[in-house]
Each structure stands twice: as C-alpha cells, then as structure tokens.
C-alpha cells in the first residue's frame, strides 16, 4: 500500500488498483532463491520463521541459529543483509567492537559478495575494516541509524538461452 493511493485529486483509485494487479501478474514465482536467515538468538530465529510464515515465504528461506563468525557460503556471488545489535544496552555496547570486527572478517571471507548493514553504531565501518561504498542516514523507529552498503563486484551477465 502507498499513501499516494489516497490522493484522489491526483489519480483515480482504479488506476492504482490496475497498476497493483499488473504488478502482481508480472511476479516471476519461478525464480530460484537461496535465502538463508541466521541469528545467534534462538528466539529471534523463531520470530523470523513466524514472520516468514505469515508472509507466505517460509518455504524459500533456510533458518538456522548460528554465530556470524561461522558465516560461510560456497557460492561466488551473493548478498549479506544484516541488522546487528546497536548497543542500546551498556553490556552490548562493550561487545560491539569485537562483533563488528567479526562481521568484517566474515564478510571478507566471501570475496565477491555485497553486504548491506543497518545499525546506529557510528564506528561500524572502523571495526568492519572497510569504508562503505554508500552510507544513508535512516531511522529505525526513533533510533537514528545508518544503512551501510558495501558493494562487491557485479557477477558476469548470463547469456539468455535462445527460445
């Protein structure tokens, strides 16, 4: 849903509904996906599984309780999307340098991958060991945060098979 759908003086609602129907018709449901979700906290893994089930995408995601230091993948290219702890509690704050250092080490072991990270931790780049290619200020609720984008190389284009 988009707020602009309610702007009746700009656009007739029927146009919005037609656009939504067209977008749904264009969804390619046969795309092969390899989505993996990890968290050290088992309760967070269960929560993520419940959210995926509610969204109807549970069958496309492999969930596992795992430490970021154990992040490995044999695929040459991929994406890491993460929202690690921000250090809002004092005991977490003390652990952040080591956590972000570990995130950086795990990311570097995946040579050709990209990483997208949301955090309010202002020293994230320092401890990851790399300056982000892009950094956008965002808000996660009321918490001023940053969306760091660490870009890996683009994979080579695949040739389209002749029909």
Please give the residue ranges for each predicted region.
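Conserved S-adenosyl-L-methionine
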Residues: 1-72, 88-89, 95
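C-terminal catalytic and target-recognition region of SAM-dependent MTase-like enzymes
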Residues: 67-70, 74-163
């Amino acid at each position: 849903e988009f707020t602009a759908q309610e702007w009746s003086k700009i656009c007739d609602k029927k146009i919005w509904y037609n656009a939504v129907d067209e977008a749904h018709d264009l969804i390619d449901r046969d795309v092969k996906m390899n989505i993996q979700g990890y968290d050290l906290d088992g309760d967070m893994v269960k929560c993520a599984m419940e959210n995926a089930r509610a969204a109807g995408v549970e069958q496309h995601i492999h969930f596992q309780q795992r430490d970021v230091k154990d992040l490995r993948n044999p695929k040459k290219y991929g994406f890491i999307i993460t929202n690690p702890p921000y250090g809002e509690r004092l005991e977490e704050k003390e652990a952040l340098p080591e956590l972000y250092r570990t995130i950086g080490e795990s990311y570097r072991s995946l040579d050709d991958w990209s990483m997208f990270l949301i955090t309010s931790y202002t020293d994230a780049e320092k401890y990851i060991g790399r300056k982000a290619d892009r950094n956008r200020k965002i808000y996660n609720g009321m918490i001023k945060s940053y969306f760091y984008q660490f870009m890996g190389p683009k994979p080579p284009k695949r040739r389209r098979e002749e029909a």
